[in-house]
């Protein structure tokens, strides 16, 4: 009597979430584009080479050409048994130095990098010293043509906090059905020659931060009043927002989730060194003469 074979078990599908860093100048942006180098395309190729089947990598947000990410989040599905903690080292061995996996986690099947997120946080950095800095050029907008008043810029930016219709800060070509944005937090601060502009929102419009920064600089230099700034976005005068800040000063800092699947230390050491707090006194004390070699 023949023994019936047990049916083969279907492979288990796992959804893997990643924390990703990249330098934007080498990519056409996040989204896959024909015959162009994209972050999504590079990741999908690297993952497919590891697991042996095509994958679709979905992100929390689509950064534009030249925009950096300190902690982008994305997910993909696979039947590979590779444990979550090994994914960073496995993928980083196949990726180029301008694209890096910081952390990975197994998430539920209904978890989505984009739709499960509660906020995105961006930082834009402006360098105001007249002398260029070769170590900053690729990560800041070098703007020195006029002095900028960060207090005026802060006053203008604060008018956006809340739930507002911000069509004035949306580039043409957007597929979004509406222009309502919940800005949760926003501030401007100066550290020596660096002016940092941070905005946190539930979501962002296409090109929003760069258009916003371009207008804030006009407020900071005094060529546009606070009243004019407010009138532009309240009355949706998109035709008056003519200049977008360059992409290299913009960095996606973090994606927030109600129940983050990543350990707390996954977010450590994810920001460029020049934006980390430092003490001028400490740096001045580190002269070669003060170092003992004996």
UniProtKB/Swiss-Prot annotation:
Formation of pseudouridine at positions 38, 39 and 40 in the anticodon stem and loop of transfer RNAs. Substrate binds at residue 122. HAMAP family: TruA. It comes from the Bacteria. Keywords: Isomerase, tRNA processing. One of its GO terms (molecular function) is RNA binding. Homodimer. Its EC number is 5.4.99.12. It comes from Synechococcus sp. (strain ATCC 27144 / PCC 6301 / SAUG 1402/1) (Anacystis nidulans). It holds the Pfam family PseudoU_synth_1. It catalyses: uridine(38/39/40) in tRNA = pseudouridine(38/39/40) in tRNA. The active site is at residue 64. Belongs to the tRNA pseudouridine synthase TruA family. One of its GO terms (biological process) is tRNA pseudouridine synthesis. This is tRNA pseudouridine synthase A.
């Amino acid at each position: 009597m023949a023994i019936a074979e047990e049916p083969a078990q279907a492979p288990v599908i796992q959804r893997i979430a990643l924390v990703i860093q990249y330098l934007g100048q080498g990519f056409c942006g996040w989204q896959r584009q024909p015959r162009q180098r994209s972050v999504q395309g590079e990741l999908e190729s690297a993952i497919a080479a590891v697991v042996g089947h095509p994958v679709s990598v979905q992100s929390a947000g689509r950064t534009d050409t030249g925009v950096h990410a300190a902690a982008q989040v994305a997910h993909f599905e696979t039947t590979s048994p590779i444990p979550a903690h090994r994914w960073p080292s496995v993928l980083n061995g196949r990726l180029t130095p301008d694209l890096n996996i910081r952390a990975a986690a197994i998430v539920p099947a209904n978890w989505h990098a984009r739709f499960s997120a509660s906020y995105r946080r961006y930082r834009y950095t402006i360098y105001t010293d007249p002398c260029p800095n070769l170590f900053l050029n690729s990560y800041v907008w070098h703007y020195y043509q006029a002095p900028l008043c960060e207090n005026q810029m802060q006053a203008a930016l604060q008018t956006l906090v809340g739930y507002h219709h911000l069509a004035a800060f949306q580039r043409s070509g957007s597929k979004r059905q509406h222009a309502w944005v919940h800005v949760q937090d926003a501030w401007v601060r100066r550290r020596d020659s660096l002016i940092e502009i941070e905005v946190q929102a539930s979501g962002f419009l296409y090109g929003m931060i760069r258009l916003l920064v371009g207008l804030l600089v006009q407020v900071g230099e005094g060529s546009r009043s606070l009243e004019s700034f407010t009138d532009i976005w309240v009355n949706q005068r998109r035709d008056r927002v003519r200049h977008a800040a360059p992409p290299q000063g913009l960095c996606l800092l973090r994606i927030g989730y109600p129940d983050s699947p990543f350990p707390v230390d996954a977010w450590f050491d994810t920001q460029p060194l020049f934006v980390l707090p430092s003490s001028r006194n400490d740096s001045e004390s580190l002269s070669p003469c003060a170092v003992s070699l004996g």
